[in-house]
Amino acid sequence: MSLHTFFVAPTGFGVGLTSTSLGLIRALERTGLKVHFLKPIAQPHPGDDGPERSSELISRTLGLSPPPAMPLAQVEHQLAMGELDEVLEEIVSRYQQAADGADVVVVEGMVPTRQSNYAAQI
């Protein structure tokens, strides 16, 4: 079987993106598929201090071990320095880690905000 990827994109902030990802993973697993998860770039809530929420929830709930998300501050710095290609290369590298041994990878996108208007570009 060839590898398939589902990109879960939000329509706005607080729309239940991680819940959707979790439900999609469980539904796919019930069909017998080996499903892995990737949140390429962390998007912390104000006041968050600790692991990226989506990956942590998926890990604790489903026992998966997704690659760590890139810290948002690092991504913003690299983009400000004109290093879009480097950011994209790192995302591809983390995707390849997530895809290892999987039939399906569920990739959770970023919520576009006024502060992260680059989210659609990535």
Spans of features found by a protein language model:
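N-terminal phosphate/diphosphate-binding loop that engages ATP/GTP or pyrophosphate donors
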Residues: 3-11, 15-101
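Loop/turn-to-beta-strand initiation segments
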Residues: 101-107
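Conserved beta-strand segments of the P-loop GTPase G domain that flank and frequently precede/overlap
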Residues: 9, 107-109
